[in-house]
């Protein structure tokens, strides 16, 4: 595939993707790993996370993965810095009672030290 064909393919993919946040479900089943990873991110989180724990998701995207964990909303917080995702989080996370705060893009968290039991 030459450069122009590759760019055309990317543009065609972009037109059908309709990505919001970090939801890449439109590529499910289209990419496979040759070797499975020796660990599973979700499994590690679920092994240690209990309902009473305070959870912070840094750079949550649109909050899709965070919401999929099913953690009690009152014990859940998230940050995001990318403006389109900040707007999405305000629309989806705040109404649920999740403590969402935009990040500053410099790595400074808008929460007091020691506020969380788990940070992902």
Predicted regions and their residues:
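S-adenosyl-L-methionine-dependent methyltransferase catalytic core, i.e., the SAM/SAH-binding region
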Residues: 7, 100, 118-120
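Residue-level preference for short coil/turn positions at secondary-structure junctions
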Residues: 51, 72, 112-114
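N-terminal, positively charged/glycine-rich alpha-helical extensions of SAM-dependent methyltransferases
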Residues: 1-26
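A short acidic, Gly/Pro-enriched loop at the edge of an enzyme's catalytic core
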Residues: 106-118
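Class I SAM-dependent methyltransferase SAM/SAH-binding core
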Residues: 54-57, 61-108
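Conserved alpha-helix/loop element of class I SAM-dependent methyltransferases that forms part
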Residues: 24, 32-54, 64-68
């Amino acid at each position: 595939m030459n450069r122009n064909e590759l760019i055309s393919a990317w543009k065609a993919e972009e037109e059908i993707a309709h990505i919001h946040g970090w939801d890449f479900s439109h590529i499910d089943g289209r990419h496979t790993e040759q070797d499975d990873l020796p660990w599973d991110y979700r499994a590690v989180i679920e092994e240690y996370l209990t309902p009473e724990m305070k959870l912070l998701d840094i750079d949550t995207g649109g909050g899709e993965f965070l919401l999929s964990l099913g953690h009690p909303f009152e014990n859940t917080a998230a940050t995001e810095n990318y403006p389109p995702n900040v707007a999405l989080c305000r629309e989806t996370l705040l109404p649920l009672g999740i403590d969402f705060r935009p990040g500053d893009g410099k790595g400074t968290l808008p929460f007091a030290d020691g506020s969380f039991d788990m940070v992902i």
